[in-house]
Regions:
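Conserved structural motif at the start of ABC-family nucleotide-binding domains
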Residues: 2, 16-19
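The feature captures the beta-strand-to-loop junction immediately N-terminal to the Walker
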Residues: 33-35
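Helix-to-loop junction immediately C-terminal to a conserved catalytic motif
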Residues: 48
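Conserved ABC transporter NBD signature motif
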Residues: 53-64
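Conserved ABC ATPase signature
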Residues: 131-135, 139
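Hydrophobic anchor residue at the start of the ABC signature
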Residues: 145
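A short, proline-enriched helix->beta-strand linker immediately N-terminal to the Walker B motif
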Residues: 150-154
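Catalytic Walker B motif of ABC-type/P-loop ATPase nucleotide-binding domains
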Residues: 156-160
Length: 162
């Protein structure tokens, strides 16, 4: 379970989320709705550990503030609404960034097969070798979604998904 207790997020002097209390149960799908500028994206970024906050965020009994950020993020698949990627990469390379060994930049055959399979399941397998910048905005979002799925997250947080 992911729980937010008395969560407040500020951007400068502006409070974008104020005293949020909510529990997200495992196995359920939740949608956060509201007008533009009401703190939905800020809440997701805060859960992912990108924004400072007041209050408490816990997942399976672990508190964000007391957990190494890299360990906190492992079970979370977060897709921001404005993903930026290296323009020189193909769609498949972008997907692989989700699990590539950052020290060696090597990819196993098994991982390559898994990435290609996810892309095919999402209906974008035919785009694997196209440059990411030559894809439509919607196709790029699907590539980013494939990248998130390749990480096999326990929690999916999608900000403005297609």
């Amino acid at each position: 379970m992911l729980e937010l207790k008395n969560l407040t997020v500020k951007r400068g002097d502006l409070t974008v989320a104020d005293h949020i209390n909510v529990r997200f149960e495992e196995g359920k799908v939740y949608t956060v709705l509201g007008p533009n500028g009401t703190g939905k994206s800020s809440m997701l970024k805060t859960i992912f550990g990108e924004l400072p906050h007041e209050g408490m965020i816990t997942y399976q009994g672990k508190q964000l503030e007391r957990t190494k950020l890299a360990d906190w993020r492992k079970p979370i698949g977060y897709m921001p609404q404005d993903s930026r990627v290296d323009a020189s990469l193909t769609a498949l390379e972008v997907v692989l960034l989700g699990r590539m060994d950052s020290l060696t930049m090597r990819v196993s055959d098994e991982l390559l097969t898994e990435a290609a399979s996810i892309m095919t399941q999402l209906g974008i397998g035919h785009l694997a070798h196209r440059d990411i910048l030559n894809l439509s905005g919607g196709q790029r979002q699907m590539v980013m979604f494939a990248q998130v799925l390749l990480r096999e997250p326990q929690i999916l947080m999608l900000d403005e998904p297609v």
